Amino acid sequence: MQEIENLHQSVLLQEVLQAFTPLEEGVLIDCTLGLGGHSKALLSQKPHLKLIGIDKDKFAQEIAKERLKAFEGRYNLLSGGFAKRFKEALETHNKEIKGVLVDLGVSSLQLDDDDRGFNFHSHALDMRMDLKSDLNAQKVINSYPVIALEKIFRDYGEIKEYKKIAHKIAERRTKKPFKDAKDLSEFLSSFSKNKKIHPATLVFQAVRIEVNSELEELKEFLQCARNLKGAILCVISFHSLEDGLVKNAFKDYAKNCICDPLSFKCACSNNHALGEILTKKPITPSPEEIKNNRRSRSAKMRVFKFKP
């Protein structure tokens, strides 16, 4: 277990604890439990807090369960997509929920596991968070029509040369289908000129988002979260697409006026804000954290406090 503690470092851990300082009791929902690092720290710090942990990765959940053993009776772990499970928990525990945490990152355990296909050297081409899901990265790369590849590279990877990359992949797979992540990564590196990041980074991001329906799930969650009352919502994102959705949702939550933007005069009484944004700018990792954990460098945390 100590090996897991050393392997996976929870991103922005102290900042998360700070965000939930007002919480003393009630229920906190960790929508993306992962290996349970944030949850363990929160349960340790707050003896009267109860936890609902959600994750679609069964293997990660087993590890989290072992790490949370000391808090038996104070937590309940649920399997599945966090948007659906959060909605169910909200319907059952609405008044008790005092905090909600969403960490949208991929864990180090998943990234480093060569059987999962998340890293550039993996001997699998999978990328599924839920191993029961039918769609995997191999199906996307080897079977999607060129126009579909173009769309996900453009929309989910924000890749400038999305057409070129999609066509090159399609051309190569007709001769020899891609067998694993290493094969795909080396192929992308053979013609990409991107010197700032690894040539495969944005393609892998786009495919992972597609395989796991990540943005759709986040949108569904943010819509459902509007129904929270008196709770603190903390979301950690890792790329601009996620952060943009969270930023805009929080702005929408905080709007007092819900009149048509084209209206000349407010007719809604101008008091419809669901709460307030507690982070005018996103919280980012300290230089020290980035030095100790390079994978934290793109993390951004936003916090919203809902009215009772």
Swiss-Prot record:
Where does the UniProt annotation locate this protein?
Answer: Cytoplasm
List, alphabetically, the GO terms of the cellular component aspect.
Answer: cytoplasm
Enzyme class, UniProt record, top EC level? transferase
Q: What is its EC number?
A: 2.1.1.199
This chain is encoded by the gene named rsmH
Residues that bind S-adenosyl-L-methionine: G36, G37, H38, D55, F86, D103, Q110
The record's catalysed reaction(s) read: cytidine(1402) in 16S rRNA + S-adenosyl-L-methionine = N(4)-methylcytidine(1402) in 16S rRNA + S-adenosyl-L-homocysteine + H(+)
Question: What protein name does the entry list?
Answer: Ribosomal RNA small subunit methyltransferase H
Q: What is its main location?
A: cytoplasm
Record's superkingdom?
Bacteria
What family does the Swiss-Prot or TrEMBL record give for this protein?
Belongs to the methyltransferase superfamily. RsmH family.
Instruction: Tell me the InterPro entries matching this sequence.
Output: RsmH (IPR002903), SAM-dep_MeTrfase_MraW_recog (IPR023397), SAM-dependent_MTases_sf (IPR029063)
